[in-house]
């Protein structure tokens, strides 16, 4: 199919004509700014980013409080759960499934959280596979407040100190979102449409 024929079909579907003016992209001014290393300041910046990304955040004093918050959510929504957690987190009550593709909620432990972007960082390991963070329609991440960092560069520094990049590093920044050829944003097509983060104070 010729390019113009294809574009004309797209225009017809959108109710547009060929000579419609193209919007000029906005110009953004990017300024480097110093970050505080104070944990409370990093947490507040991270919370601000999560609010912009439509991510629900729960502040938990302890690991057990975070687990109870998850259990309450599962009971309220009647969700089946699949997870990529190590043995430290065993004991969460709920309706479990071994198949992440059949679960309503996936649960993972994030190695770090990046305040600047609102991202959580997962590192692939034997007990941390990608399925639980990709396949269910909703996903939750446990992250310790002590693992909040300012920028991506801080994560790379820690990885380098640990011997370099592992097999897989995944960064999750809000719900999965994609856009089609005309920029229409769709949430949840290629991953979870709901994201929850549980920040644990004393971990």
Which stretches of residues belong to each language-model region?
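The feature marks the mature, well-folded catalytic cores of soluble enzymes
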Residues: 1-203
